[in-house]
Design a protein with these regions (language model features):
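NAD(P)+-binding Rossmann beta1-loop-alpha1 motif at the extreme N-terminus of oxidoreductases
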Residues: 1-69, 198-199
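Internal alpha-helical scaffold of NAD(P)-dependent oxidoreductase catalytic cores
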Residues: 111-121, 137-174, 186-224, 268
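Rossmann-like NAD(P)(H) cofactor-binding subdomain of soluble oxidoreductases
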Residues: 17, 38, 48, 58-140, ...
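Small-residue helix-packing motif on alpha-helices
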Residues: 31, 41, 67, 112, ...
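Short pre-catalytic strand/loop immediately N-terminal to key active-site residues, enriched for Gly-Thr
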Residues: 5, 123, 172-177, 228-233
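NAD(P)-dependent Rossmann-like dehydrogenase/reductase catalytic/cofactor-binding core
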Residues: 212-281
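Catalytic, metal-anchored helix/loop core of enzyme active sites in primary metabolism
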Residues: 178-179, 190, 275
Length: 281
């Protein structure tokens, strides 16, 4: 891949994708990144190396214009409330065939299209935090202006940090509920297991180690075989300890509670889509 990739804002997600590209062998001379301060620049240079062009913007548009000019893919990595302003700022500097990728939650393709030149190829991405360790899930939706080869390029870029799945944009709220916020559910489960372990007589440190390692190990098994029901059945002996625990979970309403929580998450995602619009200011 010799495409030029620009990262506007290099927080956790954009920084992880840039690092993933370098680890995959992408030429650092074809990677540009913007930061707001010299302190951030020094930290990013330590992470990405001195061959990546890192531009300090100080909050001004000129730096983002420099990074954007002639780029094949432009990743917008600022917070959702800053996306509209950033998209408008870079619009004059975009090449007509540059693909603009937003990783901001709740910002729709329509909102982005209203800020960018007519016909600009746009991709909306919902990543999750395991992308920072190369084990993420990144759901994408695209405008009709994105060509197949451009989509493949974006998938190649994002694929350096995890699994890329294309969905319809009207499914993004559901995606947010499943994979976007999903890692926190696993963390909460580990937290609950550790708390219960303490009540059963373990010290706090041991309980947390056991719970965390167990959830991580189960995740690894799912990574190698994504058939959760089969994996569950394989470790559940009739009339055994695991069956007793699982029955307690199910009888206590685990499935119903999970659905309620995820519906709440999806509803909040839909609300956020109404908050970040091109006419917000």
């Amino acid at each position: 891949m010799t495409a030029t990739i620009a990262f506007l804002g290099t927080g956790s997600m954009n920084g992880s994708i840039a690092a993933g590209l370098l680890a995959a062998g992408h030429d650092p001379a074809h990677i540009r990144a913007t930061v707001r301060s010299e302190e951030s620049r020094a930290a990013l240079a330590q992470r990405l190396g001195d061959k990546v062009e890192i531009i300090t913007t100080g909050g001004e548009a000129d730096g983002n214009h420099r990074a954007t000019a002639h780029a094949d893919v432009v990743l917008l990595g600022v917070k959702p409330y800053g996306i509209v302003e950033l998209a408008r700022d870079i619009a004059p500097a975009l090449a007509p065939n540059a693909v603009v990728v937003s990783v901001a939650a709740g910002v729709t393709l329509e909102t982005l299209a209203e800020c960018l030149p007519a016909g600009q190829p746009i991709v909306r991405c919902m990543p999750n935090t395991p992308s920072s360790v190369g084990k993420g899930v990144l759901a994408i939706s695209t405008t009709d202006t994105v060509k197949d080869e451009q989509k493949r390029l974006v998938e190649e870029v994002l694929g350096t940090v995890g699994l890329v799945v294309e969905v319809r944009e009207d499914q993004m709220d559901a995606v947010t509920a499943v994979s976007g916020s999903g890692p926190a559910y696993a963390f909460l489960l580990a937290e609950a297991m550790a708390a219960a372990g303490e009540k059963l007589g373990l010290d706090a440190d041991t309980a947390l180690k056991l719970a965390s390692a167990t959830v991580a190990g189960a995740g690894y098994l799912l990574d190698t075989n994504p058939d959760a029901p089969a994996l569950r059945r394989a470790v559940t002996s009739p009339n055994g300890t695991t069956e007793r625990a699982l029955n307690t979970f199910v009888d206590g309403g685990l499935f119903q509670l999970t659905e309620e929580a995820m519906r709440a998450c999806a509803a909040r995602s839909a609300e956020m889509s109404q908050m970040y619009t091109a006419d917000e200011d």
